[in-house]
């Protein structure tokens, strides 16, 4: 029997607290800061010796490539504009966003059905509230390595795409949204960028391929993430679902045998969810093409 929801894709590691900026960080006093128009949020300028982002075709031709899980969920309040700005400043190749949809049809970054974990609310179901009501809350830093940093506003999907849709691949996971709204999401993607196939990759839990099948029909690349322990328990479900995904994913803690099995399908494999350089080294050693990274400052430094 298939599960009704994907398991939590949070990192299980807790790396040491973030250290100061590396010697390659741009010195703001010398070079100034970029300011997001209309938001007034200072952004660290891109590190000078890092590449810019990659759209889908060059991303999948790269090895390794790096995607920011929820914008870098160990470092900054997840899926906030600030998190994505900082990941881009660190030279990340791609960005990832889980999506919820408000009662008035606004798509925004949220991993859960409610704001409870991210904002400390009590049974605040996103789909039952308007965007104006969501905006009354902030994303807390309690799930990051620096609990003292400021909380941040929730971010519309279209705002993320407007900022980075022409420079960075965006992994899109409508994790808690009813499939009846998928056509609406595809229409929004098409409206926001000229070439959706070069901006978006549909991301989802490997054992639940409905999103992949809908996205494939739109011509999008798809990434299905799996866990080694689940594959070992139900290997037949990997066999029956992997064909729906053009890219596969496996957790870095999976065994070498699990990695060999997943790689045997001849598709690119993304290691997840990477909190540290040690985890990155492990996944790359198993043959990962790319990494879905929660600890951006840990991995990219």
What feature does the model see in each segment?
Residues 69, 87, 98, 134, ...:
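Conserved, mostly hydrophobic/aromatic
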Residues 25-45:
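N-terminal export signals
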Residues 41-74:
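Long, acidic (Asp/Glu-rich), low-complexity accessory segments flanking structured domains
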Residues 65-67, 94, 169-171, 199-201, ...:
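Structural preference for beta-strand elements that scaffold enzyme active sites
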Residues 86-99, 243-245:
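Catalytic domains of carbohydrate-active enzymes, especially glycoside hydrolases
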Residues 111-214:
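Metal-dependent phosphodiesterase/phospholipase catalytic core, i.e.
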């Amino acid at each position: 029997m298939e599960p009704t929801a994907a398991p939590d894709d949070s990192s299980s590691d807790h790396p040491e607290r973030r250290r100061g900026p590396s010697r390659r960080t741009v010195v703001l006093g010398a070079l100034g800061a970029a300011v997001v128009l209309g938001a007034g949020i200072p952004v660290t300028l891109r590190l000078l010796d890092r590449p810019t982002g990659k759209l889908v075709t060059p991303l999948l031709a790269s090895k390794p490539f790096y995607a920011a899980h929820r914008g870098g969920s160990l470092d900054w309040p997840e899926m906030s504009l600030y998190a994505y700005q900082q990941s881009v400043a660190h030279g990340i190749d791609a960005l990832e966003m889980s999506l919820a949809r408000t009662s008035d049809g606004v798509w925004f970054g949220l991993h859960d059905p409610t704001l409870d974990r991210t904002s400390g609310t009590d049974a605040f179901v996103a789909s039952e509230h308007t965007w104006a009501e969501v905006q009354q809350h902030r994303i807390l830093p309690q799930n990051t390595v620096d609990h003292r940093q400021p909380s941040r506003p929730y971010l519309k999907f279209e705002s993320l795409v407007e900022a980075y849709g022409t420079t960075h691949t965006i992994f899109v996971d409508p994790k808690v949204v009813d499939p009846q709204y998928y056509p609406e999401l595809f229409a929004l993607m098409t409206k926001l960028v000229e070439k959706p196939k070069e901006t978006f990759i549909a991301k989802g839990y490997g054992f639940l391929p409905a999103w992949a099948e809908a996205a494939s029909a739109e011509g999008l690349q798809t990434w299905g993430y799996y866990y080694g322990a689940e594959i070992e328990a139900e290997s037949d479900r990997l066999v029956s679902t992997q064909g729906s995904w053009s890219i596969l994913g496996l957790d870095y803690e999976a065994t070498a045998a699990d990695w060999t099995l997943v790689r045997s399908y001849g598709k690119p494999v993304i290691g997840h969810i990477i909190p540290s350089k040690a985890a990155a080294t492990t996944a790359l050693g198993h043959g990962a093409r790319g990494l879905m990274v929660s600890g951006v400052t840990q991995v990219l430094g």
